[in-house]
Amino acid sequence: MKSLGKHLLAEYYRCDENAINDVQKVEEALVKAAEIAGATVIGKSFHRFEPYGVSGVVVISESHLTIHTWPEYGFAAVDVFTCGDHVDPMKAHEYLKEVFQTQNATVETILRGVLNIPDLRHKPGGSCITGNCGDKKIG
């Protein structure tokens, strides 16, 4: 069985409340996590809620990273979804745990697009976001 991607669902408990309530720090952390994982960042959007909390997304050529924080509980929910073979979502997860000074974390990995075929014609990543994957046209 082949899969098109890996989706990490992480829960970070007892985080540094100031770190996960600082929209600039959260944005910088997610962008750097994507880069450490080997992904190509193509966009981002973050929002700080009043009185506290941050939500954000980093769009990568290989899929996305998202975060939703509850500083009042020291909690953050993080998704790292990557496609292709050159990105390591666990590197992003490990980096984010460190940056947010997480005391306890859980992570679940889900394989996405599990296909029962001998070989994948194409595994998304890189320039394939546009539908042009070298000599293969997608869509």
Swiss-Prot record:
Q: Please state the Enzyme Commission number of this protein.
A: 4.1.1.50
Pathway membership: Amine and polyamine biosynthesis; S-adenosylmethioninamine biosynthesis; S-adenosylmethioninamine from S-adenosyl-L-methionine: step 1/1
Task: Give the site residues for Cleavage (non-hydrolytic).
Answer: E62, S63
Q: Name one GO cellular component term.
A: cytosol
PTMs per UniProt = Is synthesized initially as an inactive proenzyme. Formation of the active enzyme involves a self-maturation process in which the active site pyruvoyl group is generated from an internal serine residue via an autocatalytic post-translational modification. Two non-identical subunits are generated from the proenzyme in this reaction, and the pyruvate is formed at the N-terminus of the alpha chain, which is derived from the carboxyl end of the proenzyme.
Q: Which residues form the active site?
A: S63 (schiff-base intermediate with substrate), H68 (proton acceptor), C83 (proton donor)
Which of the seven top EC classes does this enzyme belong to? lyase
User: One Pfam family name from the record?
Assistant: AdoMet_dc
Cofactor: record remark:
Binds 1 pyruvoyl group covalently per subunit.
Name the cofactor(s) required for activity, per the record: pyruvate
List keywords of the entry alphabetically: Autocatalytic cleavage, Decarboxylase, Lyase, Polyamine biosynthesis, Pyruvate, S-adenosyl-L-methionine, Schiff base, Spermidine biosynthesis, Zymogen
The chemistry this enzyme catalyses reads:
S-adenosyl-L-methionine + H(+) = S-adenosyl 3-(methylsulfanyl)propylamine + CO2
Which GO annotations describe the biological process of this protein?
spermidine biosynthetic process
Q: Which residues carry this modification: Pyruvic acid (Ser)?
A: S63
Q: One GO molecular-function annotation for this sequence?
A: adenosylmethionine decarboxylase activity
Q: What does this protein do?
A: Catalyzes the decarboxylation of S-adenosylmethionine to S-adenosylmethioninamine (dcAdoMet), the propylamine donor required for the synthesis of the polyamines spermine and spermidine from the diamine putrescine.
Q: How does it assemble?
A: Heterotetramer of two alpha and two beta chains arranged as a dimer of alpha/beta heterodimers.
Q: Write down the HAMAP family for this protein, in alphabetical order.
A: AdoMetDC_1
What's this protein's family per the entry? Belongs to the prokaryotic AdoMetDC family. Type 1 subfamily.
Return the protein name: S-adenosylmethionine decarboxylase proenzyme
Provide the organism lineage as a comma list.
Bacteria, Pseudomonadati, Campylobacterota, Epsilonproteobacteria, Nautiliales
